[in-house]
Amino acid sequence: MSLPESPHSPATLDYALEDPHQGQRSREKSKATEVMADMFDGRLEPIVFPPPRLPEEGVAPQDPADGGHTFHILVDAGRSHGAIKAGQEVTPPPAEGLEAASASLTTDGSLKNGFPGEETHGLGGEKALETCGAGRSESEVIAEGKAEDVKPEECAMFSAPVDEKPGGEEMDVAEENRAIDEVNREAGPGPGPGPLNVGLHLNPLESIQLELDSVNAEADRALLQVERRFGQIHEYYLEQRNDIIRNIPGFWVTAFRHHPQLSAMIRGQDAEMLSYLTNLEVKELRHPRTGCKFKFFFQRNPYFRNKLIVKVYEVRSFGQVVSFSTLIMWRRGHGPQSFIHRNRHVICSFFTWFSDHSLPESDRIAQIIKEDLWSNPLQYYLLGEDAHRARRRLVREPVEIPRPFGFQCG
């Protein structure tokens, strides 16, 4: 099967007649083309591409019917092979656009410019046949065709730019944006408060709060253990103190009457009833912060039948404090003195504090007894004793009178 040959111009035919070697090489290449066609079993199909236009010359492409040159590229239906121009050259397929097409330039341009390029392109065709027969890849064939058949000047003439540069306005806008970014980067954050990422700050804040809660809980447990440990030692010394106070008659009534705040409540009948008080105990409840308990131990007396009167204060939910006490069983003809008139002021009596839980000063009285009187009753008991002792010690000391000058010894 033979490929159709493109028509030659008269200049090309004259050149072939003048050079016998050139005609022989053309016949050899025609035979090689027929051999290649027989090898491919008719699978090659000719595709005609118009010749590329030279932008420098400004010449319109010629029609093949008018004697112009036509590029013939053989395309295999199964795989790609190098293109063979009938009688002149072998060129690679136009896989790379204008650059690949520039590599298949014929010798006509060279002849017009006075350069005998037929021999060079003939050798390139033979090399292309050899590479196709050896089973080399299409990219290698294209590379060799570019290196041997095409000059750098011709490649530059037919090559077209792939990436278009932005226009003048686009370049100005890009440079302006780049300058603004650089100025903002150098200036840094402004003085005003920026947008706050609340979630970014809440997460570490929550973790810190959890750590604080854990530390507080651990401190409470440690404090409770310390209170229990030293509470046992404290109870031991309190028992010894109570044993001694029981043997001192009128100890607690004296301490109450000498206290600067509680003494106003103890007048008349209350003082007589407190004279039968033998012991006072103040104890914390099971949990120290939930309340306390007051225990008053009495001897047999003509006023009431109780030997133990208890008043309890409890701290319940939401910080509410409630109190309740033992019901006092009064003897016939006796009862609590509700109020005491002193200096035009009405003051509740001490035993009213046991029965009336609605008094405004009830909690204040309990706090004074717990934190001041009971913690150190000796200091208030000794106030009366020290004053009595101070009055007894008050003695007039003699005053030394100086003698006259004449009676002095020489």
Swiss-Prot record:
It holds the Pfam family NAP. Residues 1-31, 46-69 are annotated as: Disordered. One of its GO terms (biological process) is nucleosome assembly. Residues 18-31 have a biased composition (Basic and acidic residues). The modification Phosphoserine is found at S9. GO terms for molecular function: chromatin binding; histone binding. InterPro entries: NAP-like_sf (IPR037231), NAP_family (IPR002164). Keywords: Phosphoprotein. Transmembrane segments: none annotated. GO terms for cellular component: chromatin; nucleus. It comes from the Eukaryota. PANTHER family: TESTIS-SPECIFIC Y-ENCODED PROTEIN. Belongs to the nucleosome assembly protein (NAP) family. This is Testis-specific Y-encoded-like protein 6. It comes from Homo sapiens (Human). The lineage of its organism: Eukaryota, Metazoa, Chordata, Craniata, Vertebrata.
